[in-house]
């Protein structure tokens, strides 16, 4: 088996979570990479939807933004943005929302707005886009991001997109449909919400990763499932498809290849 990077492991693990035939509302960046890898490997019939209106997008290279022409040119059809949100998302037709994050907390709430005080921020982040609506209305949500003390924090400075709120049935109390976040996939592990509390716990460690590494890179006292699995390493097919996608993207956008 070929050697692989932690970022490749993360992308492959996230792609595997996307079931064949699912209708997936995709975020730009890591979610788009994982979703398109799924389309090219284990889930060829997945329907990828982007905020700008493409339905059934099949890009040959990864889009730079939701307005990338590649999405519209390769889609089955393109509809107005309002229809994406009213008919598809709020109408309960999105099986999976695939989101990234700047920061996430133990209940899968996402911050993509600001680091520090809102009025005097240390960092002003890109903002919400359609993520709050996706997090609120998709039948389930997958979150993908690299893991560190800076990204996995005990308390968010700002909740951009609600996951499980304050835990337990708080999401239901807020009147939000769907399951909310069902998995957080990182470069170290996979986390899933604990039954009852909806606090995210580690259910799978990637090959070679220790519990200590996860603990050191989490801003709260992370807990582990009773039975923690080892994530299956990427296959040659998965790595070949991912690297080819990255190479095509780099060539198309005049970038040097590969990792984000």
Curated annotation (Swiss-Prot):
InterPro entries, alphabetized: CoA_trans_fam_I (IPR004165), NagB/RpiA_transferase-like (IPR037171)
Superkingdom assignment: Bacteria
Spans through the membrane: none
Listed EC numbers: 2.8.3.6
Keywords: Aromatic hydrocarbons catabolism, Transferase
Record field: catalytic activity: 3-oxoadipate + succinyl-CoA = 3-oxoadipyl-CoA + succinate
A molecular-function term among this protein's GO annotations: 3-oxoadipate CoA-transferase activity
Matches recorded under Pfam families: CoA_trans
Record note on pH: Optimum pH is 8.4.
Active-site feature positions: 51
Family membership: Belongs to the 3-oxoacid CoA-transferase subunit B family.
Assembly description: Heterotetramer composed of 2 A and 2 B subunits.
Name assigned to this protein: 3-oxoadipate CoA-transferase subunit B
Gene: catJ
């Amino acid at each position: 088996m070929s050697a692989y990077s932690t970022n490749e492991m993360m992308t492959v693990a996230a792609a595997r979570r996307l079931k064949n035939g699912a209708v997936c509302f995709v975020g730009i960046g890591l979610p788009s990479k994982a979703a398109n890898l799924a389309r090219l490997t284990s889930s060829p019939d997945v329907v990828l939807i982007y905020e700008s209106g493409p339905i059934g997008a099949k890009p040959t290279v990864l889009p730079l933004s939701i307005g990338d022409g590649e999405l519209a040119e390769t889609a089955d059809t393109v509809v107005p943005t309002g229809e994406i949100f009213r008919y598809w998302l709020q109408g309960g037709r999105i099986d999976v929302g695939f989101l990234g994050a700047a920061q996430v907390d133990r209940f899968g709430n996402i911050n993509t707005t600001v680091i520090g005080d809102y009025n005097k921020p240390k960092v002003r982040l890109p903002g919400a886009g359609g993520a709050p609506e996706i997090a609120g209305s998709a039948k389930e949500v997958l979150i993908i991001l690299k893991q560190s003390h800076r990204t996995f924090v005990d308390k968010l400075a700002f909740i951009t997109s609600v996951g499980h709120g304050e835990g337990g049935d708080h999401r239901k109390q807020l009147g939000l449909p769907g399951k909310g976040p069902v998995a957080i996939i990182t470069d170290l592990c996979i986390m899933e919400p604990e039954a009852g509390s909806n606090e995210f716990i580690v259910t799978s460690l990637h090959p070679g990763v220790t519990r200590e590494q996860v603990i050191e890179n989490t801003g709260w006292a992370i807990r582990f499932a009773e039975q923690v699995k080892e994530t299956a390493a990427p296959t040659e097919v998965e790595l070949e498809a991912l690297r080819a996608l990255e190479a095509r993207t780099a060539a198309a956008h005049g970038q040097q290849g590969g990792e984000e």
